[in-house]
């Protein structure tokens, strides 16, 4: 199943990025997070290899949208002289999540049930979607590149 994720990242990422870069970053990130949340939550409802494989495909499509688009958003809102700090804090958040997730997941597994881990991921994802939808309504949170450097093109 992890091989599916890796193969999709290698062979599908460019096409997804080519499509998503045409749109505003916050709504695209929200859509990607919704797909990601659905993929995580679907694990709680699936049985057997095919079900878990389908969950991975759905989750990976969300990942292919969220990771580069959110990174672009952070780079765009950061002043050029603070871009490294902004990206550092952004990736620190990812690192903290990866550090705390096994502890929280283990507690959910022991206290409630294994499916609670995936339902918890769904709830966190939907909360993120709600937050992104709220932020996208305020123009001051819309991203515009803050650098005098020309944009990077593939």
Predicted regions located by residue number:
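Helix-to-loop junctions at the C-terminal end of transmembrane segments
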Residues: 11-25, 109
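Multi-pass alpha-helical transporter architecture, strongest
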Residues: 121-154
């Amino acid at each position: 199943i992890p091989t599916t994720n890796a193969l999709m990242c290698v062979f599908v990422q460019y096409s997804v990025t080519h499509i998503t870069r045409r749109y505003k970053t916050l709504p695209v990130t929200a859509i990607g997070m919704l797909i990601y949340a659905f993929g995580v939550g679907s694990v709680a409802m699936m049985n057997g290899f095919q079900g878990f494989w389908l969950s991975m495909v759905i989750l990976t499509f969300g990942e292919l949208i969220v990771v580069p688009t959110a990174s672009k958003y952070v780079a765009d809102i950061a002043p050029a002289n603070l871009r490294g700090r902004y990206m550092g804090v952004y990736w620190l958040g990812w690192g903290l999540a990866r550090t705390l997730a096994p502890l929280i997941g283990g507690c959910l597994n022991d206290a409630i049930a294994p499916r609670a881990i995936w339902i918890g991921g769904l709830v966190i994802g939907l909360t993120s979607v709600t937050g992104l939808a709220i932020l996208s309504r305020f123009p001051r949170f819309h991203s515009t590149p803050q650098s005098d450097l020309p944009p990077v093109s593939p």
